[in-house]
Amino acid sequence: MSVAAMTMDDQRPCMNSYDKMPPTKYEQNLNILNSSQNSGATGGPASPTPSGLEDHHHHHHPHPHHHHHQEQQQQQQQQQHLQQQQQQQQQQHAAAVAEAVAAAEQRQRLLEDEIENLKLEQVRMAQQCADAQRREKILMRRLANKEQEFQDYVSQIAEYKAQQAPTALALRTALLDPAVNLLFERLKKELKATKAKLEETQNELSAWKFTPDSNTGKRLMAKCRLLYQENEELGKMTSNGRLAKLETELAMQKSFSEEVKKSQSELDDFLQELDEDVEGMQSTILFLQQELKTTRDRIQTLEKENAQLKQAIKDEVVAPAAATNGGTNTTINKLETIHEDACMANNPTNPDCYNGNTNNEQIAAVPQIPLSDDGSNMNGNAARLARKRNYQEEEALPTVVVVPTPTPVGNNVQEAPPIREVTAPRTLPPKKSKLRGITTRRNSQLEEDHQPVTTPVAVPMIVDNAVAGMASEEAAAAAAAVNNSNTGIIPETGVQVGVPVEGGDPGAPAAPGRILTRRRSVRMQQNGSGAVDYST
């Protein structure tokens, strides 16, 4: 694009760039351009043809060959010098032109950058203007909405004011309102009272208008004061009497309520104590039931083991007496397991014949049977092992041991049941009472604190001359004397009276009475009686 083809708008950035260019550089460019134009106009490029002046001088001044040669050399030197100057000028002109072109290109690039920046700024400003216009529209719309709401509120306020304005009908309904009527009635009463007080005050003022020397007026005023004081005292007395009566009634009601509360609290404590006692009794009953169950299970197991042990001992005892003096001895033993409530059965056996005489022996199968025969160590060891296995308890009572002795009685052989003393189940102590400061304890519990109570349980065994069966503990206690006199055997034990017992068992002689006494003590404990002395 040439400078002439550029419009004024396009030339303005160039003019601005020329204005911005430093003056020294601008002057240098102008000098270079002027020098290049002058050199081109005057000399131009060196030509081989001589000029007119040179030709005239060459023709009109003939000189010798040497002089002509020097002139040619000088001309050549001048030409070379001019050529060098021209070349230098051309180079300077080319450099100036290149600089001018570079400056123009730089200005053009700057102008293009400025144009791009201006376009971007124009786009940005247009966008900002659009945003501003959009915001203006939004704000105008909001303003219109607010104005509409404001007008609506104004109209609503006007309607409310118009509605609240009292009309004639509203006033009439207000007069018919019970609350307004009550208010008017009170105002009327207050007005009447005020008028009455005003009249009384006026009358008093008129009565006070007497002379200071009049005695009648003075007496009347003193009497009025006295009556007024008496009236006040009477009112106080009546009010005080009523208040005193009400206070006494209130005090009586308070005392009655306190008594009721106290009795209720006592009843609550008593009921709580009863609940605790019932819980304790229930726990005791449960514990006793568990103990009874375990005791029954143990009794059954011991009965089974006892039956096995009796069979083994009977076989061992009867086996050595197989033959005596050519005779035979056969014994048939019938073992039966009898429960506590059942009777003992009579088991007939074959008699033992010794030289034609009948011999019946009382055999008591007990956990431990000490035999006088030294050759039966095996039997004694077996009995001791059985006793050690079956009777490992916390505290074992002395066992009654019966030694077989011959008696000239019937031909039947029976076995007596052994005595097994089972410790009575423990009972839980009662809980403390809240009404009483001391612990409530029964006589049976006090007795338990002093000495333990053991309840014997009879285990059936085979004994000679068995007594009649016992239906209950009371029947056994009642028939004890008859059994002692008829058969000579102590009930509940199967021990014959007068039979010698080994001296190594110190508790055997006192066993029957002690067992019966303990049975009675258990029954007395259940009935709540006093303690029993076990020393008898």
Curated annotation (Swiss-Prot):
Coiled coil regions, renumbered to chain: 254-319
Transmembrane helix among keywords: no
Example of a GO cellular component annotation carried by this entry: RNA N6-methyladenosine methyltransferase complex
Region span, Disordered: 1-91, 424-450
Primary location class: nucleus
Basic residues bias locations: 57-69
A Pfam family that the UniProt record links to this protein: Wtap
InterPro entries, per the entry: WTAP
Low complexity: bias regions: 28-39, 72-91
Subcellular location: Nucleus
GO biological process: cell differentiation; compound eye development; female germ-line sex determination; mRNA modification; mRNA processing; primary sex determination, soma; regulation of alternative mRNA splicing, via spliceosome; RNA splicing, via transesterification reactions
Keywords: Coiled coil, Developmental protein, Differentiation, mRNA processing, mRNA splicing, Nucleus, Sexual differentiation
Similarity annotation: Belongs to the fl(2)d family.
PANTHER family named among the record's database cross-references: PRE-MRNA-SPLICING REGULATOR WTAP, WILMS' TUMOR 1-ASSOCIATING PROTEIN
Biological role stated in the UniProt entry: Associated component of the WMM complex, a complex that mediates N6-methyladenosine (m6A) methylation of mRNAs, a modification that plays a role in the efficiency of mRNA splicing and is required for sex determination. Required for sex determination and dosage compensation via Sxl alternative splicing: m6A methylation acts as a key regulator of Sxl pre-mRNA and promotes female-specific alternative splicing of Sxl, which determines female physiognomy. M6A methylation is also required for neuronal functions.
Assembly and binders: Component of the WMM complex, a N6-methyltransferase complex composed of a catalytic subcomplex, named MAC, and of an associated subcomplex, named MACOM. The MAC subcomplex is composed of Ime4/Mettl3 and Mettl14. The MACOM subcomplex is composed of fl(2)d, Flacc/Xio, Hakai, vir, and, in some cases of nito. Interacts with vir and msk. Part of a complex containing fl(2)d, Sxl and vir.
Protein name per Swiss-Prot or TrEMBL: Pre-mRNA-splicing regulator female-lethal(2)D
Source organism per UniProt: Drosophila melanogaster (Fruit fly)
Organism phylogeny: Eukaryota, Metazoa, Ecdysozoa, Arthropoda, Hexapoda
Annotated gene: fl(2)d
